[in-house]
Amino acid sequence: MIDDYLRRFDKTGRGLGLSLGQVVEVENRKGGGMAAEADLIRARLPGGVFWVMDERGDVMTSPGFADRLGAQRDRGAGDLTMVIGGADGIDPTLRDEAGMAISFGKMVWPHMLARVMLSEQLYRAASILAGGPYHRV
């Protein structure tokens, strides 16, 4: 399901100046909590702007997310990286460094479900920006 939405995003987004980079998973096998995981994430960030998915972030509509994604593209800020934290969430220092923190609501979601939801919202945002029929209200 994740791969399907990411393929759709890549196909729809390409003509809009949005492209799919890579999906990178960081495993904190040594423990050390959120701070150690944040260091591992920082080491894998390609540079540029990153947004985090965090329950303390901004709750927004799908069109609002599309607008933010389009504005990020229009600023010419380069690649945008999306970060989903581990089981303990996002380290506060990493969250503070992010360009934006986004929440899928007040509930906490399992990591893999958050990946599906984010993948779908990326495709939906590209469809909204393209004026496509996928997003209906």
UniProtKB/Swiss-Prot annotation:
- Reactions listed under catalytic activity: pseudouridine(1915) in 23S rRNA + S-adenosyl-L-methionine = N(3)-methylpseudouridine(1915) in 23S rRNA + S-adenosyl-L-homocysteine + H(+)
Q: A single GO CC term, please? A: cytoplasm
Task: Tell me what this protein is called.
Answer: Ribosomal RNA large subunit methyltransferase H
Q: How does it assemble?
A: Homodimer.
Which CDD domains is this protein grouped with?
Answer: RlmH-like
Primary gene name: rlmH
Q: Does the keyword Cell cycle apply?
A: no
Entry's EC annotation: 2.1.1.177
Write out the GO MF terms.
Answer: methyltransferase activity
Query: What enzyme class is recorded for this protein?
Result: transferase
Q: Which family does it belong to?
A: Belongs to the RNA methyltransferase RlmH family.
